[in-house]
Design a protein with these regions (language model features):
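Class II aminoacyl-tRNA synthetase catalytic cores and aaRS-like
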Residues: 1-598
Length: 598
């Protein structure tokens, strides 16, 4: 029978009790972690978000009624205990903040009983994630998840305080906006008042924050809720939180400088890690050439090397045909891995095929200087020697090579170096390597659409020196865009925005936007630009990703209170779900079942 807590007031949280409280009578409330009856003495671990304290029940101290209730305690009962804080009678528990003290109970109230939970409420649970997400309210009682959520809260508070001190205004932007379908799919919200018309949930506050700069707000930020209807993976959710900011009368350097100071503060206070500033910078081109990725993991080397010139005259058909078709031959050096078993090498070859490789050539350098090579019979000894030299190979090394179009080679080797690093345990979660990647291509060509599309968005400023190329070689135009990367994860990105009419018109033209289409989608922004727009730039971080890396989690699901799973559903609330037909009728919406194609 649940009891009332009337007349009781909690003194503090369980693990906030210290040796300074010894001798004091206190009232603690929380959940029973476990309870053990040792014959006349009951030891109960009481838990809340701060941690655990041990409670001692003896009938001589708490009376027959409270002792009888203590005998009934089970995991996850919610209780209130009044008692005196004492030094531990037995050995201290070094695993608890309260390991040197305990509470001797005087009275007990059972505020709420609990059924047997579907899984143990414990640190580092081995329970399947789907079951934990179905009972997320129980999962969130686990200490590791509670720590993650508390750190997330601290990060959000610190971001707000830092940006406010820097002169930023926190301004909320609408979440019911106009659909401007560029990039990911929008989540659409039907309007009852305007039948047949729809709002979109924002993929980001991009246009609205630019309008705030037009409004003279100078510096804006918010922790913005964003929505993207896209396929999920470990670092994606259909709804997520963005640390969003925009600044007026600035250029690239101003944005990078203020954000370096923000990152330095966050990682020092949360992780006790000193971010070295200025943060290393690398152009997009250099990142691709050296690491095969625009978000390279800098915690280890194993850089790509272009050996096209070294093998251009060889007769190995794989290398030869790739070069004849305008591709390249590149390699990575797995230092000291010449003894890797053939089974592991074969597994890496199959892994590479998953990223478009037709195969993977390899060469092991034995300690005596001889080679074990998958393509040795197709190349002369001096060609192999030159290849090894170009790769800085030495006895004990294992070299891998990919030959194809640059895009495929980068994808294959960029991912292969990460997989090898994972297998060699080179990726230390507490080693934070930051990087700014700059000078992204402004545009990329979409074979599917048969036109150039914006790599970031249509309002990104080209680099001034590349403007003459926009008509003759659009793919070569670089953007004033930048991403902040940490340990191979893109934390966020931003750019300087276009504020000149002629450049914006040219951008729409290159993107194959007619004036009519541009006005239909972005007329409100183009109108605002007629009335004096300041040069402006901004950046947005994924808050979820930042916290994920800070706490060493494997997925952003571990730092979000109520996340979705890979099909964008919520297992706990069973959303999405059908709605009452009357609701659809009010919205003038009819559900049409898709017929299977014959």
């Amino acid at each position: 029978m649940a009891e009332s807590m009337a007349g009781l007031k909690r003194s503090c949280r369980c693990a906030e009790v210290t040796e300074a409280n010894v001798g004091q009578e206190m009232t603690l409330m929380g959940w029973v972690q476990k309870s053990r009856n040792k014959g006349g003495i009951i030891f109960t671990d009481l838990r809340d978000r701060s941690g655990i304290i041990q409670i001692i029940f003896e009938e001589s101290d708490c009376g027959a009624e409270s002792f009888a209730k203590a005998e009934k305690l089970r995991s996850e009962f919610t209780v209130a205990v009044v008692g005196t804080i004492e030094k531990r009678s037995g050995a201290a528990n070094p695993n608890l903040k309260t390991g040197t003290i305990e509470m001797r109970a005087k009275s007990l109230r059972i505020l709420s009983e609990s059924e047997v939970p579907p899984f143990p409420i414990e640190e580092n649970s081995k329970t399947k994630e789907d079951l934990r997400l179905k009972y997320r309210y129980l999962d969130l009682r686990r200490p590791d998840l509670q720590r993650n959520i508390m750190i997330r809260s601290r990060v959000a508070t610190m971001v707000r305080q830092f940006l406010a001190d820097e002169g930023f205004l926190e301004i909320e932007t609408p979440t019911l906006i106009k659909s401007t379908p560029e990039g990911a799919r929008d989540y659409l919200v039907p309007s009852r008042v305007h039948p047949g018309e729809f709002y979109a949930l924002p993929q980001s506050p991009q246009l609205l924050k630019q309008l705030l700069m037009c409004s003279g707000m100078d510096r804006y930020f918010q922790l913005a809720r964003c929505y993207r209807d896209e396929d999920l993976r470990a670092d994606r959710q259909p709804e997520f939180t963005q640390i969003d900011m925009e600044l007026s009368f600035v250029d690239v350097e101003d944005v990078l400088e203020v954000n370096e100071r923000l990152l330095k503060k966050l990682f020092k206070e949360i992780c006790n890690f000193d971010v070295q500033t200025p943060i290393l910078r690398m152009t997009w081109r250099e990142a691709m050439d050296r690491f095969g990725s625009d978000k390279p993991d800098m915690r280890f080397g194993m850089e790509l090397k272009n050996v096209s010139d070294v093998v251009k005259d060889c007769e190995f058909v794989v290398f030869k045909s790739a070069l004849e078709n305008g591709g390249s031959v590149r390699g990575i050096n797995a230092d000291g891995q010449a003894g890797m078993p053939r089974k592991k090498i074969d597994a890496l070859v199959e892994y590479a095929k998953g990223f478009g490789a037709k195969g993977l050539a390899y060469l092991a350098i034995h300690e005596d200087g001889s080679y074990k090579c998958s393509f040795g019979k197709f190349m002369k000894q001096e060609e192999l020697d030159a290849l090894v030299k170009a790769m800085d190979g030495k006895p004990g090394d294992l070299l891998f090579f990919a030959a194809d179009k640059d895009k495929v080679v980068f994808d294959v080797l960029g991912n292969l170096r990460l997989e090898i690093a994972r297998q060699l345990d080179l990726l230390k979660k507490d080693d934070f390597k930051f990087l700014w990647v700059t000078e992204f291509p402004l545009l990329e060509y979409s074979e599917e659409e048969g036109r150039y599309v914006a790599m970031h968005h249509p309002f990104t400023m080209p680099m001034e020196e590349d403007l003459p190329l926009i008509d003759t070689d659009p793919g070569a135009v670089r953007a004033k865009a930048y991403d902040i990367v940490l340990n191979g994860t893109e934390l966020g990105g931003g750019s300087v925005r276009i504020h000149q009419d002629d450049i914006q018109e040219k951008m729409f033209e290159v993107l194959d936007f007619t004036k009519e289409r541009a006005r239909e989608q972005f007329g409100f922004l183009l109108d605002a630009f007629k009335y004096g727009v300041p040069p402006h730039a901004g950046l947005a971080y994924g808050l979820d990703r930042v916290v994920m890396l800070m706490v060493g989690a494997d997925s952003i699901r571990d730092v979000i209170a109520f996340p979705k799973v890979k099909d964008a559903s919520c297992l706990m609330m069973e959303a999405p779900a059908p709605v009452d037909p009357k609701q659809l009728e009010d919205l003038d919406i009819a559900i049409v079942e898709k017929k299977d194609e014959e």
